[in-house]
Amino acid sequence: MDNESILITGPEILDAGGIRRGSVLIEDNRIADVSNTLSPGDADTVIDGTGKLLIPGLVNTHTHLSMTLFRGIADDLPLDRWLNDHIWPAEARLNGDYCYAGALLGCIEMIRSGTTSFNDMYFYMDHVARAVEEAGLRCVISHGMIDLGDTEKMTAELRESRRIIKECHGMADDRIRVALGPHSPYTCSEELLKETAALADKNDLMIHIHVSETENEVSEVSRSHGMTPVEYLDEVGVLGPRTVAAHCVWLKDWEIDVLAERDVKVSHNPSSNMKLASGVSPVARLLQRGVNVSLGTDGAASNNNLDMFQEMKTASLLQKVNLEDPTALPAMDVFSMATLNGARALGIDAGLIAPGKLADIVILNTRRPHLTPWRNPPSHTVYSASGADVDTVICDGRILLRDGELEVLEEKYVMELAEAAAAELTG
């Protein structure tokens, strides 16, 4: 790394450890010091953090980045009709150039709303990786594998996953890593799931999979295999500490115990689950059992944005109303889900503002009417702030956004490129 050193002077600092004030020194791609004794002469670049809040970069643990191109094409539908009648037919027309355009757009949206790392499952992932490399973000990518019991399709899906591993794992100074992405237990054959588990074990790779998103999925898997999705995935060896299980809405208590015992990382996607009326994930119970629960936006077609601030607020309020308990999932807990828990889920040495941690940092402008009076940073961050309050973003020690201005990518060009791609894909 040859990044210049950066000093952020005088912000309030909020992370999973609490709130404090201090200056933050970044050298290369890591936080070198956090203290009140640092001076401007200690760094090449100085950012004035007065009147601002510094937090760890947000981590989106489940999304489909290039689906920004499908934003708004199939709203107000249940998941099965949404997929079968609209999304899958549109996805059949995708190519690498379209996915690159959608990924660039998604990267800009995430930078502007404070996300520095994400977990992405989709198609043409080498093109997605190229977009992420140009944007300067950090991610785990996986080719979404679906075989529907077709042996030839299974072989092709595994071949593509191996290609992406070979070409993309460790790209961009290791900011881009590759996982295996079997779509779900109802779209993947037992053989594909077992091959995935074996390949993950052999290469020490993460697995990214949708689990128990809807009642229909649970019923379908139970009819086909005589087991719930969690039980079935455990049987075929998919569940483990490197597995990120997205959604996990329809869970029995004993299934939560299995997830906890296997140290599975759960990605909660409240906005998508609400929009598709999939149900409410038992997040409070998962956390009580010691499961690492993080947050994801899902794709922009089922959210319909990638704003993790929205996701934090929605997650907290959804648990409160569902449990009829105003104390459920308080602000600091959900903030930790969006930062430290997400970093742990993806195996990223970040999520805290502390010496030695990766320099993935977001600075918020707190001098806004909706953040005034500024008296409770955790509350304001979760319940009042939005992605529009993001002032500066640093990922891997590199400034991507400063004073609201992008320092990577050409925003106007990317929006025009994505608009044209979406028009060609969806008419």
From Swiss-Prot:
List of residues binding Zn(2+): 62, 64, 210, 298
SUPFAM superfamilies assigned: Composite domain of metallo-dependent hydrolases, Metallo-dependent hydrolases
Pathway terms, separated by semicolons: Amino-acid biosynthesis; S-adenosyl-L-methionine biosynthesis
Essential cofactor(s): Zn(2+)
Residues involved in substrate binding: 91, 183, 213, 298
Cofactor detail note: Binds 1 zinc ion per subunit.
Any Pfam family matching the protein: Amidohydro_1
UniProtKB keywords: Hydrolase, Metal-binding, Zinc
GO BP, sorted A to Z: S-adenosylmethionine biosynthetic process
Enzyme class: hydrolase
Family statement drawn from the similarity comment of this UniProt entry: Belongs to the metallo-dependent hydrolases superfamily. MTA/SAH deaminase family.
Misc remark: SAH is a product of SAM methyltransferases and is known to be a feedback inhibitor of these enzymes. As a result of this inhibition, organisms have evolved efficient enzymes to metabolize SAH via different pathways. The pathway found in methanogens differs from the canonical pathway, it uses the deamination of S-adenosyl-L-homocysteine to form S-inosyl-L-homocysteine for the regeneration of SAM from S-adenosyl-L-homocysteine. 5'-deoxyadenosine is a radical SAM enzyme reaction product which strongly inhibits radical SAM enzymes.
Role played: Catalyzes the deamination of three SAM-derived enzymatic products, namely 5'-deoxyadenosine, S-adenosyl-L-homocysteine, and 5'-methylthioadenosine, to produce the inosine analogs. Can also deaminate adenosine. The preferred substrate for this enzyme is 5'-deoxyadenosine, but all these substrates are efficiently deaminated. Likely functions in a S-adenosyl-L-methionine (SAM) recycling pathway from S-adenosyl-L-homocysteine (SAH) produced from SAM-dependent methylation reactions.
Protein name: 5'-deoxyadenosine deaminase
